[in-house]
Amino acid sequence: MYKRQIVAIGGDGTFRGATDFTNYGVPCIGLPGTIDNDITSTDESIGFDTAMNTVVEMVDRLRDTCDSHRRCNVVEVMGRAAGYIALEAGIATGASAIAVKEIPFDEDACIAKLIAQKESGKRNFIVMVAEGIPLDAAGDKEYSEKLAKRIQEKTGIETKFARLAHVVRGGSPTLR
């Protein structure tokens, strides 16, 4: 006898769709598969490790350029609703500062830290930012770009902006 069943691999939207199927009597199993790593009760979702490795590889390349030119790079990664990518990639790459929506970000403290690092002889600086944060009252979605300009103005460190965005969704699958 043939029985219909669904194995749903994805995030919140996929699981909402699977729930709809179960309401019609179709059995479903959900496997967390999202680079955002924001599925409740899941340590790490399918795709997160690949996204992390992609970000780390790209930031390593940016850091090489930052080091040779004594530069700062504000790196924006996906994470509008959850800052796991920015947080873990920031830690993995030794970022000077990390901005995620879950933790209040003090821009002045970040700038002071960059100045102190510059004065101590550091040659490269990475500021990792999750997309869409922190939004001001007007809902400014270009915060990361503007942060890069303010860092350059206030520290004297040449600062570039890199939005990694959807390229982080690609890459050869990896597993930690």
Task: Indicate residue ranges for each PLM-predicted region.
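Conserved small/polar residues in nucleotide/adenosyl-binding loops
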Residues: 1-5
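Short gly/pro/ser/thr-enriched loop/turn and capping motifs at secondary-structure boundaries
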Residues: 15, 34-39, 105-107, 135
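Acidic/polar active-site rim loop that often engages polyanionic ligands
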Residues: 31-44, 67-68, 93
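Acidic-glycine-rich active-site phosphate/pyrophosphate-binding loop
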Residues: 153-167
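Catalytic, metal-anchored helix/loop core of enzyme active sites in primary metabolism
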Residues: 141, 167-176
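Short, well-ordered, mixed-charge alpha-helical segments that flank or form enzyme active sites
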Residues: 14-18, 36-40, 81-85
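Accessory alpha-helical/coil subdomains and C-terminal extensions
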Residues: 8-10, 20, 27, 47-157
